[in-house]
UniProtKB/Swiss-Prot annotation:
The gene is clpX. Residues 3-56 form the ClpX-type ZB domain. Keywords: ATP-binding, Chaperone, Metal-binding, Nucleotide-binding, Zinc. GO terms for molecular function: ATP binding; ATP hydrolysis activity; ATP-dependent protein folding chaperone; protein dimerization activity; unfolded protein binding; zinc ion binding. SMART domains: AAA (SM00382), ClpB_D2-small (SM01086), zf-C4_ClpX (SM00994). Belongs to the ClpX chaperone family. GO terms for biological process: cell division; proteolysis involved in protein catabolic process. Zn(2+) binds at residues 15, 18, 37, 40. Coiled coil: none annotated. ATP binds at residues 119-126. HAMAP family: ClpX. PROSITE patterns: CLPX_ZB. This is ATP-dependent Clp protease ATP-binding subunit ClpX.
């Protein structure tokens, strides 16, 4: 509390946090030695609400229920209901296993590692990133394409455990209860059906190296990372209770699945097979372990991923939602960029549909939406800083289809992009 020593303001009270006087705020709340204004109270409440949003509501046992986990995933990821259910149940059971082992020793609950299979741009990595945001156990993501067998140039598989250890602030006990997501797992498939042709240090060799840490072993991890040497001290991390989630696009797997069960015959009685016209995500639903073996995963590796969740192709409606609904939606990002030029950016509903259809044609999923928007808005973003009086830019379906230019709306007239100098 502070007072001004002159005039009538001698006894004026001030907020101890923001310094505003009692005349500048609606309410000033007094404590034993401090004062706080209503504005600071509201700010504190906003901070608390934001923190509560990012934390899961716990059930009676202190374990987030699958529905609670799925509800948070729904706020960030559009569609993929089945994959969300699988992940929610797996994470819920992971929590239960950890609690069970601290209370009982009669029945040992084995972990169920997860394999996520879905077309590129369907949301596999985003699901994992969202889990990392909402969980209260250590979480790390690794890229399988950077891994090699021990002794070769590249990252050892123990580096994955090191990243988890770093996420747990080098608390070994917390790291041993964490979750690891390995992306691009399909890129370490065996390069040949014949395992004895040559040494495959970045494919089958990595699968062999991952087997033990996924099953459960005590890994020796160098605290500073890098290669191991005899004089180095190691941290011992038990991976038995670490949940592993692997994800990959598995390009070409749909052909293996489609060909399974088809009988080839010749002659007049031969059956004529129509070409597969289903979408990739629909075909992935029928995946079997034998299909993964043909793709190039070794049997032991497939056996350590008992739970398989497939993701669907994103349809036009889902892609339109992705463009506008999430908190950091692409359209919102570009609208913010245009706001910096004091210009409003508007997309017609038909334009959003055209963008979604383009992404489907390119088979890039949600990942390709940004490149499409970038190409549509490139010329406008180039011209806009040099133009005066533009209040709004409207993107129509014709603009997306490259048959028209964006519409510029000025304070006193409308004009077409690129024609402003001619009519000025």
């Amino acid at each position: 509390m502070s007072k001004v020593g002159t005039g009538d303001s001698k006894n004026t009270l001030y907020c101890s946090f923001c310094g505003k006087s009692q005349h500048e705020v609606r309410k000033l709340i007094a404590g034993p030695t401090v004062f706080i204004c209503d504005e600071c109270v509201e700010l504190c409440m906003d901070i608390i609400r934001e923190e509560n949003k990012s934390s899961l509501v716990k059930s009676r046992d202190g374990i987030p229920t699958p529905k609670e986990i799925c509800k948070v995933l729904d706020d960030y990821v559009i569609g993929q209901a089945h994959a969300k259910k699988v992940l929610s149940v797996a994470v819920h059971n992971h929590y239960k296993r950890l609690n069970h082992q601290t209370k009982h020793n009669d029945v040992e609950l084995a972990k169920s590692n997860i394999l996520l299979i879905g077309p590129t741009g369907s949301g596999k990595t985003l699901l994992a990133q969202t889990l990392a945001r909402i969980l209260d156990v250590p979480f790390t993501m690794a890229d399988a394409t950077t891994l090699t067998e021990a002794g070769y140039v590249g990252e050892d598989v123990e580096n994955i455990i090191l990243k988890l250890l770093q996420a747990a602030d080098y608390n070994v006990e917390r790291a041993q209860r964490g979750i690891v997501y390995i992306d691009e797992i399909d890129k370490i498939s065996r390069k040949s059906d014949n395992p004895s042709i040559t040494r495959d240090v970045s494919g089958e060799g990595v699968q062999q190296a991952l087997l033990k840490i996924m099953e459960g072993t005590v890994a020796s991890v160098p605290p500073q990372g890098g290669r191991k040497h005899p004089q180095q001290e190691f941290l011992q991390v038990d991976t038995t209770n670490i949940l592993f989630i692997c994800g990959g696009a598995f390009a070409g797997l749909e052909k293996i699945i489609s060909s399974r069960g088809r009988t080839t015959s010749i002659g007049f009685a031969a059956s004529v097979l129509a070409p597969e016209d289903r979408r990739t995500g629909e075909i992935f639903r029928e995946v079997e372990p034998e299909d993964l073996l043909k793709y190039g995963l070794i049997p032991e590796f497939v056996g350590r991923l008992p739970v398989v969740a497939t993701l669907e192709d994103l349809d036009e409606a889902s892609l339109k939602k992705i463009l506008v609904e999430p908190k950091n939606a692409l359209v919102k990002q570009y609208q913010r960029l245009f706001e910096m030029e004091n210009v409003e950016l508007t997309f017609a509903d038909e334009a959003l549909g055209a963008v979604a259809r383009k992404a489907i044609e390119r088979k890039t999923g949600a990942r390709g939406l940004r490149s499409i928007l970038e190409s549509i808005l490139l010329e406008t973003m180039f011209d806009l800083p040099g133009l005066e009086g533009v209040e709004e830019v409207v993107i129509s379906r014709e603009v997306v289809e490259a048959t028209a230019r964006p519409l510029y709306i000025y304070a006193d007239r409308t004009d077409r992009a690129g024609e402003s100098s001619a009519s000025a």
